[in-house]
């Protein structure tokens, strides 16, 4: 995790920053699943109520160079500004950037309980009220599942700052519950 690349989305009248970030994240997810082998992490340096307009890739120079040699940004080059692969500055802190999954939809929970044979439709309606739905204030990206075509949210949580890095593997989203990325 000694190098990084910043990718800044550039909204225009056709596409908002969040639409572009969603598309960027979806493309990155596909290429990381094929190529990165858990060696590339991400962060959002402008995170607040939203994830901001910048996605930062973290990895070794080799891992990031391999990623850059692919055409994974095809179709988004006109809407992004990509920095050079740079060395992480000295004296930085570290943090995890992880996915938070919510069991949020009461209707989905009812359907699942019925399809698994745990409950009948009437039992599910009685036992799983709408009040069980959880909401999150975390920032997110919205992407489309390639397996079933449904849209879903990937909620992203930036963990507390730490003084030392923690090694580990990153998912095909570039997120991890244990591995840290440099924060600056």
From Swiss-Prot:
A Pfam short name: Cas_Csy4
Biotechnology: If the spacer DNA has a perfect match in the chromosome then toxicity results. Suppression of the toxic effects occurs via mutations in the CRISPR/Cas machinery, or via target deletion, which might contribute to genome plasticity. This CRISPR/Cas system can be used to remove genomic islands, and possibly other genomic regions.
Gene Ontology MF terms: endonuclease activity; RNA binding
EC number of the protein: 3.1.-.-
Induction: Expressed in late exponential phase (other phases not tested); part of a large cas-CRISPR3 polycistronic operon.
First-tier enzyme category under EC: hydrolase
Coiled coil: none
Keyword tags: Antiviral defense, Endonuclease, Hydrolase, Nuclease, RNA-binding
Phenotype upon loss of function: Loss of crRNA processing, no chromosomal targeting.
BP terms from Gene Ontology: defense response to virus; maintenance of CRISPR repeat elements
InterPro entries documented for this protein: CRISPR-assoc_prot_Csy4, CRISPR-Cas6/Csy4_sf
CDD domains tied to this protein: Cas6_I-F
Tree of life domain: Bacteria
Biological role: CRISPR (clustered regularly interspaced short palindromic repeat) is an adaptive immune system that provides protection against mobile genetic elements (viruses, transposable elements and conjugative plasmids). CRISPR clusters contain sequences complementary to antecedent mobile elements and target invading nucleic acids. CRISPR clusters are transcribed and processed into CRISPR RNA (crRNA). Processes pre-crRNA into individual crRNA units.
Assembly behavior: Homodimer. Part of the probable Csy ribonucleoprotein complex with cys1, cys2, csy3, cas6f and crRNA.
Family (UniProt): Belongs to the CRISPR-associated endoribonuclease Cas6 family. Cas6f/Csy4, subtype I-F/Ypest subfamily.
Name under which the protein is recorded: CRISPR-associated endonuclease Cas6f/Csy4
Source organism of this protein record: Pectobacterium atrosepticum (strain SCRI 1043 / ATCC BAA-672) (Erwinia carotovora subsp. atroseptica)
Lineage: Bacteria, Pseudomonadati, Pseudomonadota, Gammaproteobacteria, Enterobacterales
């Amino acid at each position: 995790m000694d190098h990084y690349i910043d990718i800044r989305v550039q909204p225009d009248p056709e596409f908002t920053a969040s639409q572009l970030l969603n598309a960027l994240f979806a493309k990155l997810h596909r290429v990381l699943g094929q190529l990165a082998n858990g060696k590339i992490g991400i962060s959002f340096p402008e995170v607040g109520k939203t994830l901001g307009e910048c996605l930062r890739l973290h990895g070794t120079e080799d891992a990031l160079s391999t990623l850059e040699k692919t055409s994974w940004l095809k179709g988004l080059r006109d809407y992004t500004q990509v920095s050079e692969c740079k060395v992480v500055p000295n004296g930085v802190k570290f943090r995890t950037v992880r996915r938070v999954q919510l069991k949020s939809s009461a209707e989905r929970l009812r359907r699942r309980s019925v399809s698994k044979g745990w409950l009948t439709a009437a039992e599910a309606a009685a036992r799983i009220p709408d009040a069980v739905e959880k909401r999150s204030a975390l920032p997110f990206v919205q992407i489309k599942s390639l397996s079933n075509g449904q849209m879903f949210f990937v909620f992203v949580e930036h963990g507390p700052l730490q003084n030392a890095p923690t090694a580990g593997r990153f998912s095909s989203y570039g997120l991890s519950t244990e591995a840290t990325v440099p924060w600056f």
